[in-house]
Amino acid sequence: QNGDVRLRGVPGGELKVDARIRVSSSDMDEAKKFADSIAIEISSTASGAMVKTRYPEGKWFFGSRRVSYAVDYDISVPEGAGVSVRNKFGDVTAENLKGGTEIHNANGRLTVRGGRGVARLENAFGALELAGNAGDADVTNANGTMTIAEVDGQLVARNRFGRVTIARAKKLDFSGTNADVSVSVSGPSSVTTSFGTVTVTTVNGDLKVQNNNGSITASGVTGEAELNGSFAPINF
């Protein structure tokens, strides 16, 4: 829940988990007791394996204000395994996962590279990057930039309050607000947003854009183009 998580897909069938516990306190004994109370649990399930962090309860959270803590994970998983992650207050990085990926994170950067299968990503209060996915992707971010490239499948993306850059998606459906949106070298695309600019270049198929209170610039569309806006120019 609190700490950075790094996941790597590797050949073979072995799961390897490295966990690093970090505790800071004005009292050394208190820090050591708290660290000793953190449990790293690894268990088998019907569908695979589960890794979970358990933190101590009671006075540590309600009576003491001097302890800060995190558990950082470096996890190697069989590259064909599906992965599900839930984290708070830390960065999450996933690379070379080929069995589908589901990640929910908050208050940190989320980066996924070189995946295959369906990717479901959700983040808040941090940047989100998806670079290379051989499959569909469903991506949601808030309060941070979104950068997506090389999605060989349908991309459904949502973002608020951060710049959005999307390149080379096989098919795109984007919705958002309060953000500048840039789309390039995509298949059929739909963009719905407000209070930001929309720039689209090179669409191999139809393009539909709805932008309120922001300009629209589009070029290189091979199919039909439907561009709707208000209170700002449209350039095509």
Each language-model region and where it sits:
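Short helix-to-loop capping/linker segments positioned immediately adjacent to catalytic or ligand/cofactor-binding
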Residues: 197, 215-216, 233-236
